[in-house]
Amino acid sequence: GEPTLQPELPEFLEKIRDLGYAIKLDTNGTNPGMLKILLHNGILDYVAMDIKNSPRRYAETCGGADILSRVQESVLLLQDSLADYEFRTTVCRPLHTEREMEEIGRWLKEAKRYFLQPFVDSGSLVSGGVQAHTRDELARLRQAVLPYIPNTQLRGI
């Protein structure tokens, strides 16, 4: 689940840090209030944030109309912070096209790093109609983002 929904997260992560461990947060960005606390307190060494789709198709992809504004706030928090971070998108057909990727690129322009990850059908989370992109399609999706985010890479292929 989403770790930033846990109200005790800052205290828990402080205990982990006190043990000498670095802290990486994986988040969907829907709780910018908690992210702001964690960034402000300097608890996080690295943040990996999911970007589900272009702003135009975010609600369609995530099933919530109010999610986008919270995710946009989290994007700005990360881009304005000193924390190291990445954005990442798990791409699949038909949700992610070159148009969507270009829109994401414009939205996240000059992000530190952005990863495209291929969808893998586990059979348990997604109903029918969603398919993985081919390697060539993934390469084209990456090319659509590169003019905006030069450090765009493919992961997991």
Regions found by a protein language model. Name each.
Residues 1:
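Short acidic donor-binding/metal-coordinating loop in glycosyltransferase active sites
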Residues 4-137:
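Conserved AdoMet/S-adenosylmethionine-binding subsite of the radical SAM
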Residues 152-157:
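Acidic carboxylate-rich catalytic motifs and surrounding loops in phosphoryl-/glycosyl-chemistry enzymes
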